[in-house]
A protein has these predicted regions:
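Short sequence motifs at beta-strands and strand-loop junctions characteristic
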Residues: 30, 51-56, 93-97, 143-152, ...
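Gram-negative (and chloroplast) outer-membrane scaffold detector with strong preference
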Residues: 62-151, 162-168
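Cleavable N-terminal export/targeting peptides
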Residues: 1-31
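Short glycine/proline- and aromatic-enriched beta-strand/turn motifs that initiate or cap beta-hairpins
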Residues: 20-68, 72, 78-81, 86, ...
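Predominantly the C-terminal beta-signal and adjacent terminal strand-loop region
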Residues: 160-221
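Transmembrane beta-barrel strands of outer-membrane/channel proteins
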Residues: 34-44, 74-80, 103, 116-124, ...
Length: 221
């Protein structure tokens, strides 16, 4: 928590002097009104989550409020860290949903740009059961869920593919993510009972991840 907290503070201190120069910077570097995009994410479990979770994968959506050096970044992600087939058309899925916001600093012009960011937000750990194909009534069933706070810090590289009115770039990056202590169902922690109900085994730990992302960023002018 200390490392990510220091990263958040450090990025905030770096970007504060730029606020007063924002209009001048826009005159020199007209980067447009911001950008949005989507990335495919893969998360490597760290610490206690390495024992209780598994490699997670999912999608992330983000928006950046300015095309200049200093901007506000807002992003949300969904990833699944455990999927099990229980038999007879019943499967279970354990997931993490996260939303956060914070400063982003982008450096460089032209086809190659680098950026760094830090965010603070919240996350939900939840598990569902899907009864498709089993002849059971209903579709997905919510089994378990818990909220917690989350912080992240990371950076990446933007490789421009086109400019014009709608600039497009490949977005390649990584971040450290820390979810504060939370109760969740570990990998393999859902067991189906003879009556069709489920028993959920829970653990309570901090959840640390290293998340890698690859996607596309689309500029707004």
């Amino acid at each position: 928590m200390r490392r990510i907290g220091m990263a958040v503070l450090g990025l905030a201190l770096i970007t504060t002097p730029l606020v007063g120069q924002r209009s001048a910077l826009r005159e020199v570097h007209d980067g447009g009104s911001g950008s949005f995009g989507a990335t495919f994410v893969v998360a490597q479990p760290l610490g206690a989550f390495r024992r209780n979770g598994d490699v997670a994968a999912g999608l992330s959506l983000f928006g950046v409020t300015s095309g200049g050096p200093l901007a506000l970044r807002i992003d949300g992600s969904w990833m699944a860290y455990d999927a099990q087939y229980q038999g007879y058309g019943v499967s279970t899925l354990s997931q993490i949903g996260t939303i956060g916001a914070g400063p982003q600093l982008t450096l460089g012009q032209g086809a190659l740009r680098i950026y760094g960011f830090a965010t603070v937000g919240g996350s939900l750990f939840w598990s569902t059961a899907s009864y498709g194909g089993c002849g059971c009534s209903g579709g997905d069933s919510f089994l378990d869920g818990h909220f917690t706070t989350t912080t992240s810090a990371g950076g990446g590289l933007l490789v421009g593919l086109s400019r014009g009115r709608t600039p497009i770039a490949i977005d390649l990056g990584a971040r450290a993510v820390r979810h504060d202590r939370v109760s969740y169902v570990p990998a393999g922690g859902l067991t189906q009972n003879s009556d069709g109900s489920f028993t959920a085994r829970e653990v309570e730990t901090r959840v640390d991840m290293r998340v890698y992302q690859l996607g596309v960023s689309i500029g707004i002018r």
